[in-house]
From Swiss-Prot:
Source taxon at top rank: Eukaryota
Organism: Macaca mulatta
Predominant place of localization: other
Entry function: Subunit of the V1 complex of vacuolar(H+)-ATPase (V-ATPase), a multisubunit enzyme composed of a peripheral complex (V1) that hydrolyzes ATP and a membrane integral complex (V0) that translocates protons. V-ATPase is responsible for acidifying and maintaining the pH of intracellular compartments and in some cell types, is targeted to the plasma membrane, where it is responsible for acidifying the extracellular environment.
Keywords: Cytoplasmic vesicle, Hydrogen ion transport, Ion transport, Membrane, Transport
Gene Ontology, cellular component aspect: clathrin-coated vesicle membrane; melanosome; synaptic vesicle membrane; vacuolar proton-transporting V-type ATPase, V1 domain
Protein name from the UniProt record: V-type proton ATPase subunit G 2
Family to which this protein belongs: Belongs to the V-ATPase G subunit family.
Compartment(s) where it occurs, according to its Swiss-Prot or TrEMBL record: Melanosome; Cytoplasmic vesicle, Clathrin-coated vesicle membrane
Alphabetical GO biological process terms: synaptic vesicle lumen acidification
Length: 118
């Protein structure tokens, strides 16, 4: 009977060691999964940062050229407005004199299509 008891004890100890090994294996697996998840998250973050930086550089290049274009258009518009204002100042008196001459200098005459019925 003692040998049976000793055999049972050995079986229980072997079962306990097997359960400990299984538990350790599960813990190692959980740690590996957690580590793999963290590494994957870091890779995703790094990729996202790279793509964001690439997008920002492309956006800056596109917006930079648009900024230059808008500045050039603004400057050209100012030059045209200044040219129109100077032209208006130069021609103002002459145009006013012409307009007043046409309005005030009335020459009455019979229209060529008018027929005198007699």
């Amino acid at each position: 009977m003692a040998s049976q008891s000793q055999g049972i004890q050995q079986l229980l100890q072997a079962e306990k060691r097997a359960a400990e090994k299984v538990a350790d294996a599960r813990k190692r697996k959980a740690r590996r999964l957690k580590q793999a998840k963290e590494e994957a998250q870091m890779e995703v973050e790094q990729y996202r940062r790279e793509r964001e930086q690439e997008f920002q550089s492309k956006q800056q290049a596109a917006m930079g050229s648009q900024g230059n274009l808008s500045a050039e258009v603004e400057q050209a518009t100012r030059r045209q407005v200044q040219g129109m204002q100077s032209s208006q100042q130069r021609n103002r008196e002459r145009v006013l004199a012409q307009l007043l001459g046409m309005v005030c200098d009335v020459r009455p005459q019979v229209h060529p299509n008018y027929r005198i019925s007699a």
